[in-house]
Amino acid sequence: QAEAGEFGGGAINLTTASLPDENYLTAGVGISGDSETTAQLGYTYYGSKRDVFGFDDGTRDLPAALRDNGGELVDAGVLENEDTLILQRNNQIPANFSASLAGGYATDIGDTRFGAIASASFSNGWRTRGATQETATAGSLFTSSYGVRTENRVQASGLLALGLDFPQEHKIRLTNVFIRDTSKVARVRGSFESIQTPFEDLEDDRLTGPYDALSYESSYVQRQLITSQAVGEFEFGAVELDLRGSYSKSERDSPYERTTQYRFVGSTGGYAVNLGTPT
């Protein structure tokens, strides 16, 4: 089993059948959910039109005005992808969806047996979780914060295996694997600097406030693995020769993560961007 991940190197040995005993085709569709996420309140944000498939279309690329400014601050008005800064409340988080398709085919070409096995799967799932974090000074509770985190995870994978069996006990196998894992996270965290309201009274409302401070965080992480392996098994009388060659490429991209902090302003009864602690 191989998964897209963050690793520096290593060897991947792909061992799978490539000549099915009989031809087949299977398909499956699944829908699932949980009581804390499905059809409940969560947070998300608009990224790109292809987010549902786990691919960014360039919307999250670092704006040219920021990329070419030598690390200096720029006016927020020149940013072209401000939509990714705005977190939205979704009162009906969708159910999880998955689909799969697999098939195998084998035939004789003269004295040689040829076979192929292919499979593909796709899933789009959601998960909302809440967490409380507290800090204490000299034995007394100093600050307390409650956060809600909604993750939209899209996974896609595919496999294609080809095989040839020759009459002289020679075998050739070619296996290709593609795995992609995308995590889109929206997180809202509210905090009190002086403890007056028990958090047990607020958790069910999922951050309706008012809090002393609010933090909006968005992230988008794409991980991808592509690997191909060719194997040859040859017999020449008492001599056996095994050859193996493989190529793998793993990628991780986390474009343009942002955190925006707000402070509650009592005179206006609303929140203003906190410019004192930029991130």
Where are these regions (language model features)?
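Transmembrane beta-barrel wall of Gram-negative outer-membrane proteins
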Residues: L73-F192, R223-A230
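Short beta-strands and strand-coil junctions in structured, solvent-facing domains, enriched
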Residues: Q1-E3, P20-D21, G33-E36, T107-I109
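A beta-strand signature from Gram-negative outer-membrane beta-barrel systems
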Residues: Q1-A27
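Flexible glycine-rich, low-complexity coil/linker segments exposed to the extracellular/periplasmic environment
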Residues: T37-Q92, T268-T279
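Membrane-embedded alpha-helical bundles of multi-pass transporters/translocases
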Residues: G47, L87-Q88, G104-A106, R244-Y247, ...
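Transmembrane beta-strands of outer-membrane beta-barrel pores
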Residues: I31-S35, F122-W126, F178-T182, F236, ...
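Residue-level detector of the transmembrane beta-barrel scaffold of outer-membrane proteins
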Residues: Y24-G28, G115-S119, K171-T175, V231, ...
